[in-house]
A protein has these predicted regions:
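Conserved HGGG/HGGXW glycine-rich cap/lid loop of the alpha/beta-hydrolase fold
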Residues: 1-41, 77-82
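Flexible "cap/lid" subdomain of the alpha/beta-hydrolase fold that forms the substrate-access gate
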Residues: 33-75, 81-187
């Protein structure tokens, strides 16, 4: 399951290796990506179809639509990681194993027992927005920014064109960008 801003096509170099190892591999476009349809693309549109459990249902439905009742595993990258994790957590009878990349999964949240007597504690710690704004070159948190109306407009109508926008986006995340400091993996 791909991440953001990606498509099933993102797995094109991984799929042959898995197939060569004997697996039947599929990589769908997740709901709202690629050529998927059935919801409003309007910024103010209903977001309920994009709830995490709907993405999990999509994965389970795809497995069943392809005629399987269980699969060897589900792989998730970036936004696909929590979807894959919840697939394996909620339906271990369907998804026999899980691999997660680029996004940690902390497990299910604790159940809110006794909330009538013990009110939830407010979040503590420094504000990420204040910390980023205080940098010598002020920045915005990308996930927060992507949820704003200006970001929506930027992505739908990039002045430089979609190709140049995505090329710059991926360059900014790459080891080729001078301000990015990747660290080699041990082993």
């Amino acid at each position: 399951l791909h991440g953001f801003p990606e498509l099933a096509w993102s797995w094109r170099k991984v799929m042959p290796a898995l197939a060569a190892a004997g697996y039947h591999v599929i990589a769908p476009d997740q709901r709202g990506y690629g050529r998927t349809t059935g919801w409003s693309a309007d910024y103010d549109g209903d977001l309920r179809p994009f709830r995490l459990l709907n993405a999990v249902r999509d994965a389970i439905g795809l497995v069943h639509a392809l005629g399987y009742r269980q699969v060897a595993g589900v792989f998730g990258h970036d936004f696909g990681s929590p979807v894959a994790a919840w697939c394996a957590l909620l339906r271990p009878d369907v998804f026999q194993s899980v691999a997660l990349m680029s996004a940690p999964f902390g497990g299910p949240p604790a159940l809110p027992f006794d909330t009538d007597r013990h009110k939830p504690k407010p979040a503590t710690g420094p504000s990420i927005h204040a910390a980023l704004a205080a940098l010598p070159r002020p920045r915005k948190h990308y996930q927060w920014y992507y949820s704003t109306r200006p970001a929506n407009e930027d992505m739908w109508h990039c002045p430089q064109g979609v190709h140049a926008f995505l090329r710059a986006y991926y360059h900014h995340k790459s080891a080729d960008w001078a301000e990015n400091r990747p660290y080699p993996l041990a082993g």
